[in-house]
Amino acid sequence: SFTEMIDEHFPDDETLMAADGAELEVLNDTLRIMALMFDYLGDWNEIARFYDEHGTRYFEYRIYAELSNQYYEKKYYKSSASTLRAFVDRFPDDDRAPLYYRRLISGYEKAGYPMLRRKHKEIFIERFGVGSPYWETHGEEVRTLITVALGDYIWDLATFAHGWGQQTKSARDKRERLEQAAGWYREYIRSFPKAPDAV
């Protein structure tokens, strides 16, 4: 099977990352075919189903990424995002989880889904933000990866709510939106107390 082939030739992530030339070509072809097969069997959920039965593999992250890319190329944007979300849900403590979630948000941004983009920015902040269980259990390298996106996401949500609050005619909507904006500004200051724009 394809799984056994990767097991044999790429026993760990180091050997997988070091693949080049013809070896890399074979690896990429194998991952592409595996992603197609899982899609044929149903969708992204088939990856977890298969490896729950046959044993978890360190390289599952590559299959999720490949399947997500295939969906995106076909303009199945929500399926692409769901595949990345499935990886994060399956491996919530993985060092790659924030990176995959950032890809999900970026995909919605490029595809023109502003509401979904904002919704998932909120989820990202809640899931990976400063002080979250994920944040507390990961080191500086992973935190840096999170921080790169975190400031942009919080600021975007704050300015969106602020702008909407200023434009709306309804007093109730105005109050709600401005309260939301204030909440996001507070979150920004809490997360980045030393930032020059936090005062």
Listing of model-derived features with the role each one plays in the protein:
Residues 1-199:
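Acidic, polar-rich low-complexity tracts and alpha-helical solenoid repeat scaffolds
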